[in-house]
Amino acid sequence: MASTTSTKKMMEEATCSICLSLMTNPVSINCGHSYCHLCITDFFKNPSQKQLRQETFCCPQCRAPFHMDSLRPNKQLGSLIEALKETDQEMSCEEHGEQFHLFCEDEGQLICWRCERAPQHKGHTTALVEDVCQGYKEKLQKAVTKLKQLEDRCTEQKLSTAMRITKWKEKVQIQRQKIRSDFKNLQCFLHEEEKSYLWRLEKEEQQTLSRLRDYEAGLGLKSNELKSHILELEEKCQGSAQKLLQNVNDTLSRSWAVKLETSEAVSLELHTMCNVSKLYFDVKKMLRSHQVSVTLDPDTAHHELILSEDRRQVTRGYTQENQDTSSRRFTAFPCVLGCEGFTSGRRYFEVDVGEGTGWDLGVCMENVQRGTGMKQEPQSGFWTLRLCKKKGYVALTSPPTSLHLHEQPLLVGIFLDYEAGVVSFYNGNTGCHIFTFPKASFSDTLRPYFQVYQYSPLFLPPPGD
């Protein structure tokens, strides 16, 4: 307790009587009292303080006179104050009032010299605070290092998780867009199928109705003829004997000769049938049920195109020599037609485009322009889809229609319904609808059409591959 009392006494001696705090930059005057330099200076600047004579003042405590020039720094007192500040920060034992200078290794706590002698610490390993401080400081620093590493890992994992969240949301959004797009394409496909089937049904209805109405009209004429004969016979029966017997044999012969011709039976069985569930769940199977084999026609190939021996692959290369200048050959662009011509029915064929960066695919009229002035648009007899680096996927309508596909088709399917005037494009791998041209009216032979780009060969797989 003596140590505590001594410390309190020194604190009182080091306290400025003006600001009542530990002195800052202490200075002493002639009488021996000390003050903060700033406090004593400000004190005598106060107009209420009376001067004894020029630059002479009274000590605030003892009223002894002193001259302002006699202020001198008290370094010894300053050092004491710093020591007191450090001592004031040190922890003391609540039970004994002594400072903690010892550390009990067994209990892991700070103790004073009196605690060390108490029964509860008897036999415990103790050491001076300054002796064990460095060791525990190193342990704490190691713990800090470990925790910082964990914090860094936590931060990395947090960033990684944030990135995963973003990636997951993007993935879900892409899938959401794909689902919407696929269903929209499927709805478009089903709508086109519905129109096609309804058109076929209407055509079948009109054909059968026409035959039935023709037969109905014939029966009307025959009914009138029979009524005329009946009336003639009834008049004879109601007349005189002479009228009845006049040309009676001829009348009877004509009557018995009248027959009701049986027309060829008109079937009421419908041929236009549609299994909607099958269309809905198996588009690819439906398309491939109309698949035909397509090969390339070398007589129409542009001079820069190289055809394989089986005529199923075409590549763009250098000008081919020894080629005729047939009017059937394309000269404006590197194009080639398929050998097969379509004049009726439904047809479907596929083109393996791979990861090529450009191509034009579709069908065209047999008599399209193949030289200067060639335009790929329906008005000129072309129904084609294009992929190019600058504009991506484009349907060559008039004007062109930009397409936004969620996945790159490696296999493109082209579907033609000649009677319905429909040309549609599909992703051959998934069956997803890509685009359908507005309804057209075909009157000429249609042929598969291909335009080949540099480093983007095209391959025509046989049906069923």
Curated annotation (Swiss-Prot):
Zinc finger (RING-type) in chain: 16-63
Keywords: Cytoplasm, Immunity, Innate immunity, Metal-binding, Phosphoprotein, Transferase, Ubl conjugation pathway, Zinc, Zinc-finger
Cellular compartments per GO CC: cytoplasm; cytosol
Biological or metabolic pathway of the protein: Protein modification; protein ubiquitination; Protein modification; protein sumoylation
Parts forming coiled coils: none
EC number(s) per entry: 2.3.2.27
Record text on subunit structure and interactions: Interacts (via B30.2/SPRY domain) with TAB2 and TAB3.
Presence of the UniProt keyword Ion transport in the record: no
Modified residues (Phosphoserine): 70
Domain of life from the UniProt record: Eukaryota
Species whose genome carries this gene: Homo sapiens (Human)
Zinc finger (B box-type): 88-129
InterPro entries, A to Z: B30.2/SPRY, B30.2/SPRY_sf, Butyrophylin_SPRY, ConA-like_dom_sf, PRY, SPRY/PRY_TRIM38, SPRY_dom, TRIM/RBCC
GO BP annotations listed: innate immune response; negative regulation of defense response to virus; positive regulation of canonical NF-kappaB signal transduction; positive regulation of DNA-binding transcription factor activity; positive regulation of NF-kappaB transcription factor activity; positive regulation of viral entry into host cell; positive regulation of viral genome replication; proteasome-mediated ubiquitin-dependent protein catabolic process
Entries under SUPFAM superfamilies matching the protein: B-box zinc-binding domain, Concanavalin A-like lectins/glucanases, RING/U-box
CDD domains attached to this UniProt entry: Bbox2_TRIM5-like, RING-HC_TRIM38_C-IV, SPRY_PRY_TRIM38
Top-tier EC class: transferase
Cellular localization per UniProt: Cytoplasm
Designated gene of the protein: TRIM38
Domain B30.2/SPRY: 274-465
Lineage: Eukaryota, Metazoa, Chordata, Craniata, Vertebrata
Descriptive protein name: E3 ubiquitin-protein ligase TRIM38
Keyword Cell membrane: no
Function as written in the Swiss-Prot or TrEMBL entry: E3 ubiquitin-protein and E3 SUMO-protein ligase that acts as a regulator of innate immunity. Acts as a negative regulator of type I interferon IFN-beta production by catalyzing 'Lys-48'-linked polyubiquitination of AZI2/NAP1, leading to its degradation. Mediates 'Lys-48'-linked polyubiquitination and proteasomal degradation of the critical TLR adapter TICAM1, inhibiting TLR3-mediated type I interferon signaling.
Expression sites (tissue/organ): Ubiquitous.
Catalysed reaction equations from the record: S-ubiquitinyl-[E2 ubiquitin-conjugating enzyme]-L-cysteine + [acceptor protein]-L-lysine = [E2 ubiquitin-conjugating enzyme]-L-cysteine + N(6)-ubiquitinyl-[acceptor protein]-L-lysine
Gene Ontology MF annotations: transcription coactivator activity; ubiquitin protein ligase activity; zinc ion binding
Record-listed Zn(2+) binding positions: 93, 96, 115, 121
